[in-house]
Amino acid sequence: MALEKSELGALLVMDTNNIRYLTSTKIGEWERDKICRWALLTKGSAEPILWDFGSAAVHHRLYAPWLKPENCKAGLLGLRGTVNPAFGLMERHAGEIAALLRDAGVAKMPVGIDIIEPPMLFELQKAGLTVADGQQTMLEAREIKSIDEIALLNRAAAMVDGAYHLVHEQLKPGVRENDIV
């Protein structure tokens, strides 16, 4: 809904929280700060496209029936600078993204991005795409919660409250944190 109301033609997200929101996938805490996965959602489509490590892409095809198998793609970008842009991964994926946007009829519209590595931003621009702020559109989308989301948030909050209560009961002078955990 937020994308449909915006001037954006698509959202390209690389923030793990936004990827989870658009695709209902998460591969673990280790990928949190790597900018190694990304998802694309075009205006007028309810089908996100997800790029992930090859083995994770295969896993999504097998165990994420809510995603179209052909929309679970293997991909790798710069891993926050550890893969040199000269290797060509960013250029290749920017071209792939531009082609998908052309196919969806939104390539001439701005692409909203939440976070990105600068070399990938430059490659998207070289591919002829106009890049815009997509963070606010994603935040607007995430404001609206279903009854199930609210129930899960309440359950998670209750679990945290319970954990803090147990810590509070055990915490006394002379007790070390690692003894409680």
What are these regions (language model features)?
Residues H165-V175:
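C-terminal helix-coil-helix/basic helical segment that borders enzyme active sites and/or dimer interfaces
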Residues M1-M159:
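A composition/biophysics-driven feature that prefers long, compositionally simple stretches
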Residues A157-Y164, E177-I180:
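Active-site pocket-lining segments that scaffold enzyme catalytic pockets across diverse folds
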